[in-house]
Amino acid sequence: MSLRLGVPSKGRLMEKTFAWFGAHGIMLSRSGSEREYAAEVHGIDGLELVLLSAGEIPRELQAGRIHLGVTGTDLIREKLVNWEQRVEPLVELGFGHADLIIAVPDCWVDVETVDDLDGAAAAFRQTHEFRLRIATKYHRLVREFLRGA
């Protein structure tokens, strides 16, 4: 049986992941065309490389289809409920940083804090009879942040 390592399948995260492992004596490379999700591992026996989107890696870890994965902590926290009980971070790789921010249109000159946003949302709901919507792909992280604000 081999260990299955999930890594990002494209872009800067894949390149940085391959470079990080290469610097530690484990060579990762794509095999086949750019459209194929095939890869090879050199420098260590018993390790199978699985190329996935960074967003799929948390779920594949949780499901047990991969044993190790390289992805962002933002994606782990967003995709997995009670993530602390489901996965164990092993190494901080030092790349792929992401800042999550709450932004409003420039014309909202009176909204400078989360409390201001809360007031604007309350006024919006009273006027329009439905809630103000926040566009995000990080629903859980935004909800946790706003509940704690």
What are these regions (language model features)?
Residues 1-149:
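Domain-level signature for soluble enzymes in the chorismate/prephenate branch of the shikimate pathway
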